[in-house]
């Protein structure tokens, strides 16, 4: 049974973008196969959100820089006595290969942008009730096509995200595992510390505390205020133990 709740908070814009992309790609696979109108709207809304995120920044450039940075960090670890050099070399090779695939891939999201069905649905999503069958007969007929045909088309769409998804997963896994959790204590519901050029805060709280963190800050300094889920009757203990990793 789950006894701890994990919260993550980005400390810079690139990490904020990466976490949003990770979340949206995960959401694309939640309700597969797409078998009805509700499932289709969930899928296409996440596709539209993903394309919006892609258009706001240089996702590929930032990710390629991070792949190179992680390779340099691993190179430094090779010199440390007692480390698993084979494991480090395997990781470096995987990062290098992911970068090569990403840099040679088409523009991120371009395959999805050029798809007629995605474009039609995307145009209607901002209109309340704009995806009714009379607004989008194309979607209506698509939902009545054989399930195998829809599955194959969705698989093709998701495959176009594979170079990005693989590189992003590698980077985020390395960042998340770069620092262990350490026990910390807040006083009167408040905690602050130096970020030490961190990209990501990871925080674990006991589920039974029914508290959540409000986090503010950047890579050099951050502050956490703990809030009760029940804003009227909930209490925050004077001293609260929690686990924190500045990655």
From Swiss-Prot:
It comes from Escherichia fergusonii (strain ATCC 35469 / DSM 13698 / CCUG 18766 / IAM 14443 / JCM 21226 / LMG 7866 / NBRC 102419 / NCTC 12128 / CDC 0568-73). Interacts with FtsZ. PANTHER family: CELL DIVISION PROTEIN ZAPD. HAMAP family: ZapD (MF_01092). It holds the Pfam family ZapD. Keywords: Cell cycle, Cell division, Cytoplasm, Septation. It is found in: Cytoplasm. Signal peptide: none annotated. Its main location: cytoplasm. SUPFAM superfamilies: YacF-like (SSF160950). Cell division factor that enhances FtsZ-ring assembly. Directly interacts with FtsZ and promotes bundling of FtsZ protofilaments, with a reduction in FtsZ GTPase activity. Belongs to the ZapD family. One of its GO terms (biological process) is FtsZ-dependent cytokinesis. Gene3D superfamilies: YacF-like (1.10.3900.10), YacF-like domains (2.60.440.10). This is Cell division protein ZapD. The gene is zapD. GO terms for cellular component: cell division site; cytoplasm.
